[in-house]
């Protein structure tokens, strides 16, 4: 599906992971379906392996089996690393779901540092390729008086992704669907949500 028009109530899925401790081998991943950055239409979840390589498949399965799938127009994720260094392949997720994927981060990523950190894990080369495959890092100011957010995207042009991010950043510089997913995931896994995504 090619995203060309960004309506005010575009159906967006925001995804983030919850807290996991050093003894945990699995982590909760929560998806929140919202209309723009205003109304919650649904919540979905899955689990992924800490420092594994299954996040792309688990999220694709979560999305494709959801009753909300027909209404979804774009997936927003909180970065490309989940549950430690379980690296999300945004291009593969786009291919498997047919939806544009925008990975959002608060600070400009240091790709070299991420690639270096991956050397401590198994299947280093596979992880490195996924990180590099995410493509160039873009930026957008979603709120007038706040710093920009950074993003990588698959299945959508950067200029259209910028419109999506501005439209969904209704209360903070990060898109509201990602923030709500963060609050739910950390609230469930820690007993209380943290103050910010």
UniProtKB/Swiss-Prot annotation:
Gene3D superfamilies: archaeoglobus fulgidus dsm 4304 superfamily. HAMAP family: UPF0215 (MF_00582). This is UPF0215 protein MK0057. Belongs to the UPF0215 family. InterPro entries: Endo_dU. It comes from the Archaea. It comes from Methanopyrus kandleri (strain AV19 / DSM 6324 / JCM 9639 / NBRC 100938). Coiled coil: none annotated.
């Amino acid at each position: 599906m090619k995203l060309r028009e960004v309506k005010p109530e575009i159906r967006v899925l925001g995804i983030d992971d919850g807290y996991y401790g050093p003894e945990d081998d699995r982590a909760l991943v929560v998806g929140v379906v919202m209309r723009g950055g205003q109304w919650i239409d649904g919540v979905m979840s899955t689990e992924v392996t800490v420092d594994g390589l299954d996040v792309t498949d688990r999220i694709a399965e979560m999305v494709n089996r959801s009753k909300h799938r027909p209404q979804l127009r774009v997936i927003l994720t909180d970065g490309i690393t989940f549950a430690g260094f379980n690296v999300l392949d945004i291009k593969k997720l786009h291919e498997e779901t047919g939806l544009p994927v925008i990975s959002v981060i608060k600070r400009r990523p240091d790709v070299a540092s991420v690639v270096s950190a991956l050397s401590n894990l198994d299947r280093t080369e596979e992880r490195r390729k996924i990180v590099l495959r995410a493509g160039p890092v873009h930026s957008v100011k979603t709120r007038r008086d706040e710093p920009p957010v950074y993003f990588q995207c698959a299945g959508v042009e950067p200029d259209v992704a910028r419109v999506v991010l501005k439209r969904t950043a209704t209360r903070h510089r990060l898109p509201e669907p990602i923030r709500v997913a963060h609050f739910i995931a950390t609230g469930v896994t820690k007993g209380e949500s943290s103050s910010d995504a």
